[in-house]
Design a protein with these regions (language model features):
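N-terminal signal peptide c-region/cleavage motif recognized by signal peptidases
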Residues: 17-21
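Short, solvent-exposed beta-strand/turn "edge" segments of beta-rich domains on protein surfaces
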Residues: 23-25, 37-46, 115-121, 202-205
């Protein structure tokens, strides 16, 4: 099967692969706002994401979707696509790598998911919450969001607070960092031939991880 039919987070991956197959990775760009959600007892219950896709990919994704007003898609119009997105993301672990006190946390299937469309910027934003299988009180949480194969590029949204804590104990401290820019050695070409040799196990995209850390007493 074509690589890009299996390496997509939206149902239009085949179209995207055909249009961009000769180009280097990444093929999809996502800007995100992340929220870590706490219960009243101070336990961490899950992650709330808002991921905005680039305009080109959003255009592919909305092709063929009937809208009540041309060029304006409601949440109802986009509901089937949102469901497909969430189903596809499960295969990739929601591009989420999270540890508490050094131990990997298991994730449940997302809730409260929907897509919004911004007609001005012509982009889609996927909103969803990923609960932890077991809420946890932790002194040390580390979260990374990235695609191991770098098909998708994730970056924090350019706002004052791209990452927030919701309901966390007041003494908890949040820090986050962006990945460094990729440095390519002279003569090294990072086109499709290079990436076709990689698999998720190579974890090449880890160098582009957006890192979040929460320390609580």
């Amino acid at each position: 099967m074509n690589r890009y039919f299996t390496r997509t987070i939206l149902t239009v991956a085949g179209l995207l692969a055909g249009a961009a197959g000769a180009c280097a990775h990444p093929h999809v760009w996502v800007t995100m706002q992340d929220e870590l959600v706490y219960a009243p007892d101070g336990s961490l219950t899950g992650l709330r994401y808002s991921w905005t896709f680039d305009d080109m990919f959003s255009a592919f994704a909305t092709q063929g979707i009937d809208a009540k007003k041309p060029g304006e898609f409601t949440r109802e119009d986009l509901a089937p696509l949102a469901k497909e997105n969430i189903t596809s993301l499960k295969d990739f672990g929601y591009f989420t790598f999270v540890k508490a006190n050094g131990k990997k946390l298991e994730l449940k299937e997302p809730t409260d998911y929907y897509l919004d469309y911004n007609p001005k910027d012509t982009v889609l934003t996927l909103h969803f919450t990923v609960p932890f299988k077991t809420p946890i009180k932790t002194k040390d949480l580390n979260l990374e969001v990235y695609d191991p194969e770098y098909f998708v590029d994730f970056s924090f949204k350019d706002v004052k607070e791209p990452v927030t804590l919701s309901g966390a104990p007041s003494a908890c401290k949040l820090t986050f960092s962006k990945p460094q820019d990729l440095t390519v050695a002279p003569g090294q070409q990072l086109g499709e031939a290079f990436f076709n040799q990689l698999s998720a196990a190579d974890n090449w995209g880890a160098q582009f991880a957006n890192k979040i850390s929460v320390k609580c007493p």
